[in-house]
Amino acid sequence: MSKDLKILCKDPALELSCYRDHQFSGRKFQQEKLLKESSTLNMGNLSFYTTEEKIHELFSRSDIRNIFMGLDKIKKTACGFCFVECHNRADAENAMRFLTGTCLDEWIICTDWDVGFREGQQYGRGKSGGQVRDEFREDFHSGRGGFGRQTQI
């Protein structure tokens, strides 16, 4: 396939985002290589009320291996993200292609590649136990726990 044709056939939904996990212990090029081969998705912008069952329902046309719901590290309640392990890269690519921008529980979800789930990764990294981005939110969102934690202090 020519270089020009490859550019035309590129699917922007499958490209790597600029986000990199800062807790990854290897080098940047190693992380990018793993991301390009990964069959694990990180789903974000989920409602705090989204359940594992709803994620299974969303992936009903795919055969998935595991779902790891993101948890507030203090309260052990959902905090708006999850990891979905697919059996192969093709299933993960289809999910990425068709689920990015889908509305679930009145929230538009976003998907990104992840190098693979590691124990402890399911916990939010914010000071209050949830996601960092929710701590600085200044507006009220009932689906994401109300006001941001830092704005309440």
Curated annotation (Swiss-Prot):
GO terms for cellular component: nuclear cap binding complex. Gene3D superfamilies: 3.30.70.330. InterPro entries: NCBP2, NCBP2_RRM, Nucleotide-bd_a/b_plait_sf, RBD_domain_sf, RRM_dom. One of its GO terms (biological process) is mRNA cis splicing, via spliceosome. Residues 39-116 form the RRM domain. GO terms for molecular function: RNA cap binding. CDD domains: RRM_NCBP2. Pfam families: RRM_1. Belongs to the RRM NCBP2 family. This is Nuclear cap-binding protein subunit 2-like.
